[in-house]
Design a protein with these regions (language model features):
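Extracytoplasmic and endomembrane cell-envelope/extracellular-matrix remodeling and assembly machinery
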Residues: 17-39, 43-46, 167, 171-202
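Second-shell loop/turn segments in exported
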Residues: 26-31, 41-45, 81-89, 105-116, ...
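Sec-dependent bacterial lipoprotein signal peptides
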Residues: 1-16
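Export/targeting segments at the very N-terminus of extracytoplasmic proteins
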Residues: 17-76, 131-134
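Alpha-helical segment that forms one wall of the substrate-binding/catalytic cleft
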Residues: 91-143, 147-155
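Catalytic and substrate-binding regions of cell-wall glycan-acting enzymes that process beta-1,4-linked
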Residues: 83-85, 139-191
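Short, surface-exposed glycine/acidic/tryptophan-bearing loops
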Residues: 69-101, 145-147, 165
Length: 202
């Protein structure tokens, strides 16, 4: 494929990408706007035993639900770019090395960090592993986010104690997770209705 074709393909894929939800503060509205996201979240719940609201609260913090989110570019002398702070990318802000571990361990070579379902499954896997490795409850958004940010070894070594800002961010993630959980209880029955029921009864 020539360069023009590659540019065209990139523009097409960008145009097809799902925009961030209009109301990211409300989990019910997020899933009502993007029914496929709810299906992906339920698949993660069934596969990894992870409650719907925890990875969604973490994803809000990581990318604000932007498919192509990246850390900001760093500049030398204020104008010479010299790379980004990390290889984090996509909905889950998964770093390349950790993503590659996930892909290899789960035989998902087709998975993409810019795909919501893949990124959500990655988060479910990471939360599951954090529970296995460090004994952190899958429902504990605070502890799970610390694992997610610091890695399993960093969490065991309590590296977060030297980062007061990270503890504050993790508390915000936990607060959001609790709000999302309360909202989800109000709309789960409606979201779980079959497509046929929604077709006839709205």
């Amino acid at each position: 494929m020539n360069k023009l074709g590659l540019v065209g393909l990139a523009l097409l894929l960008t145009g097809c990408a799902t925009p961030p939800p209009k109301d990211p503060e409300n989990l019910c509205n997020i899933f009502k706007e993007n029914r496929s996201w709810y299906k992906a979240a339920k698949n993660t719940e069934q596969k990894w035993g992870v409650p719907v609201h925890v990875p969604m609260a973490m994803m809000y913090q990581e990318s604000s639900f932007r498919h192509n989110a990246r850390p900001p570019m760093r500049y030398f002398l204020g104008f010479i770019p010299y790379g980004r702070a990390s290889t984090a990318y996509g909905y889950a802000q998964a770093k390349t090395m950790t993503w590659d571990d996930y892909v290899r361990e789960n035989n998902r070579s087709w998975a993409r960090r810019s795909n919501f379902a893949d990124a959500h499954d990655f988060m479910g896997w990471f939360i599951y592993k954090s529970h296995q490795v460090n004994g952190v409850s899958k429902w504990d958004a605070y502890g799970q986010y610390l694992n997610y940010h610091e890695g399993w070894g960093g969490y065991r070594n309590k590296s977060y104690n030297a980062k007061p800002w990270l503890i504050q961010v993790s508390r915000r993630v936990d607060d959001r997770s609790k709000r999302y959980a309360a909202q989800y209880r109000q709309c789960q029955k409606d979201l779980d209705r079959s497509w046929l029921w929604r077709l006839f009864f709205g």
